[in-house]
């Protein structure tokens, strides 16, 4: 009668260790480290429950040490069913310590024309990551200020619960 992998053992200095435990011991660290990203910066700001007032500017302060690498800058939004629109207009300003700055207007599409929310979610809460800049080079080392302001017609918009910024170095794919 044959034995299964679970029944096989390896003899090690007088002790027996199940092969499945040995495999698990070697595979677990590989899985753990392969699933982690090397974000340079990733943080969320909480929006008050009453809503995001257009006069309130959400600020983020990443420190960039490597100006040779290129980065992807993503905007993360957390929102609920109480948000009344399909999209969200944002004004984003990035400013270096030297005073250099650039401003963009970003249209974030949160739902399709039938009201089905994009992104991942559970219950009445959703999260979506939106690409803001891809392959971006920061011109100088130092602290940057990234400001995000809602640009909708309503002064206060309910349903947006958090806004975040994630900066990740671009990794080259083998063979490029």
Could you say what each language-model-derived stretch is?
Residues 32-34:
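C-terminal motif of bacterial Sec signal peptides marking the signal peptidase cleavage site
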Residues 36-39:
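Bacterial signal peptide processing site
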Residues 43-64:
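Post-signal peptide N-terminal segment of mature Sec-exported envelope proteins
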Residues 68-70, 85-87, 139-143:
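Extracellular Ig-like/FN3 beta-sandwich strand-entry sites
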Residues 69-81, 144-150:
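A short beta-strand element within beta-rich, extracytoplasmic domains
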Residues 79-82, 127-130, 135-137, 150-160:
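Short acidic/polar inter-strand loop motif in beta-rich domains
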Residues 106-137:
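An anionic, turn-rich surface loop/hairpin at beta-sheet edges
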Residues 140-155, 159-171:
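Internal, hydrophobic beta-strand segments that form the core of beta-sheet-rich folds
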């Amino acid at each position: 009668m044959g034995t299964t992998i679970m029944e096989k053992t390896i003899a090690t200095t007088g002790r027996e260790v199940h092969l499945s435990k040995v495999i698990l011991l070697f595979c677990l660290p590989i899985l753990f480290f392969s699933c982690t990203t090397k974000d340079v910066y990733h943080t969320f700001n909480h929006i008050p429950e009453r809503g995001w007032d257009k006069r309130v500017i959400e600020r983020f302060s990443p420190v960039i040490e490597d100006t040779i690498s290129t980065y992807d800058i993503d905007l993360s939004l957390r929102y609920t069913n109480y948000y009344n629109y399909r999209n969200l207009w944002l004004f984003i300003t990035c400013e270096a310590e030297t005073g250099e700055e650039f401003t963009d207007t970003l249209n974030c599409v949160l739902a399709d024309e039938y009201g089905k929310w994009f992104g991942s979610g559970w219950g009445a809460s959703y999260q979506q990551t939106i690409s803001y800049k891809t392959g971006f080079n920061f011109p100088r080392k130092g602290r940057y200020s990234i400001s995000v302001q809602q640009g909708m017609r309503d002064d206060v918009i309910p349903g947006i619960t958090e806004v975040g910024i994630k900066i990740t170095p671009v990794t080259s794919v083998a063979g490029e």
